[in-house]
Structures are given as structure tokens and as C-alpha cells.
Regions:
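Extended beta-strand solenoid/passenger and fiber regions
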Residues: 318-432
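Serine-esterase "nucleophile elbow" of acetyl-processing enzymes
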Residues: 32-103, 109, 429-502, 514-524
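Secreted/periplasmic serine-hydrolase-like ester/acetyl group-modifying domain
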Residues: 127-235, 529, 660-667
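Catalytic His-Asp segment of secreted/periplasmic serine-dependent ester chemistry enzymes
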Residues: 258-312, 572-667
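Hydrophobic membrane-insertion alpha-helices, especially the h-region
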Residues: 6-26
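Active-site segments of SGNH/GDSL-like serine hydrolases
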Residues: 228-254, 529-533, 556-591
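Solvent-exposed soluble domains appended to multi-pass membrane proteins
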Residues: 186, 190, 210-317
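Oxyanion-hole/transition-state-stabilizing segment in secreted/luminal serine hydrolases
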Residues: 104-131, 182-212, 462-464, 470, ...
Length: 667
């Protein structure tokens, strides 16, 4: 009997050893097989976490953070390194969460940005994705909880078959879509998720209700997250829940149910939930190819929201605010249903909320009846019974994520924004930076022009541009040339004569046509505003077209300088990227051409692109700032042009944002 037992034990030990060798061989016999795959990027993200000893933000989520987090922006605004573990939610939230434990240190911030199945999804792991993701990086298996080992052992031979049959991946769901050094998504997603309703069965829907139509967090989930909270806090780090971005059109429950989930989580688990999830319910034009995947614009908006959340809860310092108050007039919003939208500045007092009807008459709206303000978070939303136009009625017809502009009596695409946009006059406590003087860029102006302005003499400023310079889609006075005229006259107590040579639909060739006419008028300063119409189309960044644009601008600059006319070059912003003729690379390239010409000729370049980019992180430009959903700014949007131009007229060096009524301060 004893011999039999010894034999049995020896046999079992041999079997275990042989099996372990087989497992080891399966995992390590062929290295880096899945290196090109999307899921294998988890190895890079894990190594970044391992090696980052600086204070850091650890993002734990599924693919909503691989497709929706601008890590550079987050690092610059917070001062923390970012380790973004966000990848395929099919790994299981348990896996991402366990990986994060590898290197949580004092002062770190752990963010739980799980997608909306987290409340009942901490019991399973995705063996196929995890094993192919880890590949031959055996050390990562230590983060698989022991009670799940049997599942991975059982999957081993299927994994071996997949490994032998694997073909390299490419495209957006592959390693090539990401930056190796930090795991940042770099693949351009310049399209809207316009096919959602055509493929709703494939994309799915989002609801946070259980089978009984109740908001619930399972015991397993609550126990795990409570333990995770304790683990993080024992290491003197902070942990917060944050909302993931999600496609609003896919939501089948009430948006108030998301607030109930927030309350239930804080009461049950006790992790501070620092987001308003309603702000993260994005429209199709901010999403790309899945319910939780932002496009390139949505990624910026989501990151900006997250930064706001971190500031509001005190996790990172907020910008210093003074007790000085300034008015902001006419900031515009396009409001959908009862979803909130952020103000550019947190309002102190709402002065007036209004819009215009089809006849062009002003319509006033009432707080508490038509809209609700969250003064702490700085948001506005419609009420259920609001008479404010609902932007959900705005129509855009897309094809494959892009729209074609159509202007005919029978059909117009897309709808213009004017009828839907809400305008708000309010005041706010300015930041300390708004009390500081603007940078003095007046050296770009001639001594003669500076002398005239400082001595109260009349000056003449001319503008040659396209439809933006002509004030298209504005009320006639609400465009940047008018704002500049007003600002200079009020600030310096001078008379400014303006000459506008701009013409809708034209490109930089107009500048060449009007050379002599402009010279004959002898302006002191000429502002040149071209590029929006020059750069469009698939071949917009071709050498031939870029060279033609550059030659037109530079030839004109040289001629005007020879005639003692100061020149200012005005850049242009990123128009709606989902328009089928937009070329985002050309937008950046043409702005760089302008900057290069300005630098070489020692003239001022107004960086409109950067100002609009910063505002676009807070307010989706196409909805909230464009009058036509494409590229014509509304009256408030034109103030952003003034913001980019005015530094060159800060001649005495004393101009401050707080002193300029139409200047929009952008952090």
C-alpha cells in the first residue's frame, strides 16, 4: 500500500512538472507573437507604471481611456505623470485594477474610470485577451487572482493554437495606433459616429439599470472596490471615481439614473465620485467607433472635463481667483435635452439668458423655469419644460462619419446653429492672471504707428480676408474687426478708421488682386486673414498648393512693407473636422507657413488656432462657437480673434484682460 501511495504521489508530481513545462513552453517558445496587437499594448502600459516613481495619476479603465485621454494635456495641467492603464474592457475591470497595484505610492492619484458595467463586473476575466496581451511576459501573471488560475490553465491549449495561427494586426486596433513611450493613442479619429442607428444591434446600448429597473451595485463589486480603496489609502495615495465618456444617443435609461449610481456608490463603497456623469454623455460628433470611444475632438473635451473634476475636488490646485469681477457677454451654448454644458468661466451672477427667434427678435429665458445653473461646477442646462431651443433637433446628414455641405432650396446640410444657440451674459471672479498685463508685442509695429496711438492721433487699419473677415454669419457688428476698432478707441481714446477689403468665398489670391487698391488707401496697418478657404480638400497640403499660398502671402507682405504699411498675419482655427473637405494636416501646415513668414519678415502672427483649440477643450466649437456648424464663428467666437490679435497693440505694456470688455481670457 505504501509503495502504491509513493508511486501515485511520484506520478502526480511528474505530471505536474511535465504540465508546468508544457505551460512554460507554450508561453515562452515563441516570443513577441502578439506584439503588433491592440491588447499587447497592456505590456507597455504596465512597464510605464512599474518604472514611474514620480508622483503620478493612474487611470484604471477599459478602452474609454485608450480612445479618450490626452495624457500630455493631463500632465501639463496637473503636474503629475500619467500612467494610463485604459485598454480593452474585455480584459475585465478586475484585471486593470489588479495591475494598478504594482506601483501605487504616497501622493499618487488613482482614478477609476470604468465603463458602465462596472457595478456588476468584478467576477470574470477575459482569458483570451489577457493571455495574448501578456504574451510571454510571465511576471504579469502574478496579478491574476488565485481563484481565477483554473480558468487560465483550462484555456492554455486554445491559447497555444491561437498563438500559432496569429497574423500581425494593423490599423486603429493595433500597436501602431499608439505611442510606445507613453501608450498615448495617436491615430487620427476625424469622423463622427454617424452610423450608430444603422448598426445599433452591433454597437449596443447603455443602461445602468438591473432587470428590475433599479440602480444596483453587486456585493462582489462593492467588496472588491472597498478593499481596493483600503489598499490605495494604506499607501497614502488618493482614489476617486470619475465618469467615462459615453455616447448619449445610446443611453436607454434616464440620465438622472447616473446621478443615483453616483449616490449609491458613495454611500455603499465610499470612494469620492468627483464627476458629473451627465457632462460625459457625448453626442455622436464627439465619438468615433464604439459606445465609449471618443474621436480626436472628444478626447480633448473629456480630458478637460477630468482636469476640472480634479480641481473641483481639491486633488490638484485650482487657478488662483481674485475678488475682481468682470462681465462676459454673449457666451454661446447649444443645449441638448437636460444635459449640462460648461461655462468658460464659473459664473458669479447671471445677468441675462437669451436667444433669437426665426424673425430675429430677442427672446429672454428665466432661471428655474427654462434653465438651471450649477454655480459650483459652472454649468447650465435646460429644464424638462424649457422653452430654450433643444439642439437635439439640429440636423446633420453624415456618410461614413463625414458630412457634405449642401446649400440648395430643397435641402440644406448641415442645419445652421443660430436658431438653437443660447447666449448668456454673466459676471465672474477673474483669475489673478487676468489682472496681469498682457505680453507687449508692439515691437512688431512700426515706431510711427506706436507714436500715433500713444499720442492720440487717428490711425487707419485695413483688413483683407475671406468671409470670416467679412463678418459672415454675424449681426454685422459682432465680428473681430469691429471689436478691435472698439477696443482701441476706448482704451487709447483715439479714432480708428477701418477699411475692409474682405470678401466671402475668396482665398489669398484676393490679396494679390487688391494690392494696389490697398496701397492707394494708405492704411497704417493691414491685417491679412486667409487660409480657411485656401487649405481645404484632400490635396490641400500638396506642395503645389502650399507653395501658391505661401507665395501669395509673402509677395503681398513684401510689397506692403516696401510701402511702409505695417502687416499683421492672422491664422485660422480648426474648422469642423467631420466636414468631408477638411484637411487637418493642412490646417496646421498653413498656420505654420504664416508663422514662418511672420518670423522671417519680423511681423506679428495672431495665433488664432491656439486660442480656439483651448476654448474647444471646454466648448465643442462646431456646436457652441460656430454659427454654421462648419467654420463661421458667431459673435462670441469672433471675440477669440480679438484675444489673439490684441497683444500687438499693447503699446504701453499696461493692457490687462480685465480692462478689455471684448477680450475672452483663456487659460
Amino acid at each position: 500500500m505504501l509503495k502504491f501511495l509513493k508511486y501515485t504521489v511520484a506520478t502526480l508530481l511528474c505530471f505536474v512538472c511535465i504540465f508546468e513545462l508544457i505551460v512554460f513552453g507554450i508561453i515562452t517558445q515563441k516570443k513577441n507573437v502578439f506584439d503588433s496587437s491592440y491588447q499587447n499594448l497592456i505590456v507597455d502600459k504596465y512597464r510605464i507604471l512599474e518604472e514611474t516613481d514620480d508622483k503620478k495619476i493612474i487611470m484604471i479603465s477599459g478602452s474609454s481611456s485608450s480612445f479618450g485621454l490626452d495624457q500630455k494635456m493631463l500632465e501639463e495641467e496637473t503636474g503629475y505623470k500619467v500612467t494610463n492603464l485604459g485598454l480593452h474592457a474585455g480584459f475585465g475591470h478586475l484585471f486593470h485594477s489588479e495591475l494598478a497595484k504594482e506601483n501605487i505610492k504616497e501622493g499618487d492619484i488613482v482614478l477609476l474610470g470604468y465603463e458602465y458595467n462596472w457595478f456588476n463586473n468584478f467576477e470574470t476575466l477575459g482569458q483570451q485577451l489577457i493571455m495574448s496581451g501578456i504574451d510571454d511576459n510571465i511576471d504579469m501573471y502574478k496579478h491574476i487572482p488565485v481563484n481565477h488560475w483554473k480558468d487560465f490553465v483550462g484555456y492554455m491549449f486554445q491559447y497555444a493554437a491561437e498563438k500559432n495561427a496569429y497574423v500581425d494586426a494593423s490599423g486603429i486596433y493595433s500597436r501602431e495606433a499608439f505611442q510606445g513611450e507613453d501608450g498615448q493613442m495617436t491615430w487620427l479619429r476625424d469622423y463622427a459616429m454617424s452610423d450608430y442607428f444603422d448598426y445599433i444591434n452591433d454597437y449596443g446600448t447603455i443602461s445602468i439599470l438591473n432587470a428590475n429597473d433599479e440602480v444596483e451595485i453587486t456585493d462582489t463589486t462593492a467588496q472588491y472596490l472597498s478593499a481596493l480603496k483600503k489598499y490605495v489609502e494604506e499607501r497614502e495615495a488618493s482614489i476617486y471615481f470619475v465618469s467615462s465618456p459615453a455616447l448619449y444617443e445610446s443611453v436607454t435609461c434616464s440620465i438622472d439614473d447616473f446621478l443615483k449610481l453616483v449616490e449609491l456608490e458613495e454611500n455603499t463603497i465610499g470612494i469620492p465620485y468627483i464627476s458629473d456623469p451627465r457632462l460625459y454623455l457625448f453626442p455622436i460628433d464627439l465619438m468615433s467607433n464604439a459606445l465609449y470611444h471618443c474621436n480626436s475632438e472628444g478626447e480633448k473635451v473629456r480630458t478637460s472635463l477630468l482636469i476640472d473634476d480634479l480641481r473641483l475636488c481639491g486633488a490638484i490646485p485650482a487657478e488662483a481667483v481674485s475678488q475682481t469681477v468682470k462681465d462676459e457677454k454673449g457666451e454661446t451654448f447649444a443645449l441638448v435635452d437636460t444635459l449640462p454644458k460648461r461655462f468658460l468661466h464659473k459664473p458669479r451672477t447671471i445677468k441675462r439668458v437669451y436667444g433669437y427667434n426665426a424673425e430675429g427678435r430677442e427672446v429672454l429665458f428665466t432661471e428655474g423655469v427654462d434653465y438651471v445653473i450649477d454655480y459650483e461646477r459652472g454649468t447650465i442646462r435646460r429644464t424638462d419644460s424649457s422653452s430654450i431651443p433643444n439642439y437635439s433637433g439640429h440636423r446633420v446628414v453624415y456618410h461614413s462619419g463625414k458630412f457634405t455641405w449642401v446649400n440648395s432650396p430643397e435641402f440644406y446640410n448641415p442645419d445652421e446653429n443660430g436658431m438653437f444657440q443660447l447666449k448668456v451674459d454673466y459676471d465672474y471672479f477673474v483669475s489673478e492672471k487676468e489682472l496681469e498685463a498682457l505680453e507687449n508685442k508692439s515691437a512688431y509695429l512700426s515706431e510711427n504707428v506706436r507714436h500715433k496711438i500713444l499720442n492720440g492721433e487717428d490711425i487707419t487699419i485695413a483688413l483683407c480676408g475671406d468671409s470670416i473677415g467679412a463678418g459672415a454669419a454675424t449681426n454685422g457688428n459682432g465680428y473681430f474687426f469691429y471689436y478691435l476698432d472698439e477696443t482701441l478707441e476706448q482704451y487709447y481714446n483715439i479714432n480708428v478708421e477701418t477699411l475692409n477689403f474682405s470678401m466671402g468665398g475668396r482665398s489669398s489670391d484676393l490679396l494679390i488682386e487688391d494690392l494696389q487698391s490697398i496701397i492707394d488707401m494708405r492704411p497704417d496697418v493691414l491685417m491679412v486673414e486667409f487660409g480657411m478657404n485656401d487649405h481645404g480638400g484632400a490635396d490641400g497640403n500638396s506642395e503645389e498648393r502650399v507653395t501658391a499660398y505661401k507665395n501669395n502671402i509673402e509677395k503681398a507682405v513684401n510689397v506692403f512693407q516696401e510701402n511702409n504699411i505695417d502687416v499683421i498675419l492672422i491664422g485660422f482655427f480648426q474648422q469642423n473636422m467631420t466636414w468631408d473637405v477638411e484637411n487637418m494636416e493642412a490646417t496646421r501646415l498653413y498656420n505654420e507657413v504664416l508663422k514662418d513668414i511672420a518670423d522671417r519678415n519680423k511681423i506679428y502672427f495672431a495665433d488664432v488656432y491656439s486660442v480656439f483649440e483651448k476654448v474647444g477643450n471646454v466648448k465643442p466649437l462646431s456646436r457652441d462657437v460656430m454659427a454654421d456648424f462648419i467654420h463661421h464663428p458667431n459673435e462670441w467666437g469672433h471675440k477669440l480673434y480679438l484675444t489673439s490679435i490684441i497683444d500687438v497693440f499693447n503699446i504701453n505694456g499696461d493692457m490687462r484682460p480685465v480692462d478689455l470688455p471684448d477680450y475672452v481670457y483663456v487659460e
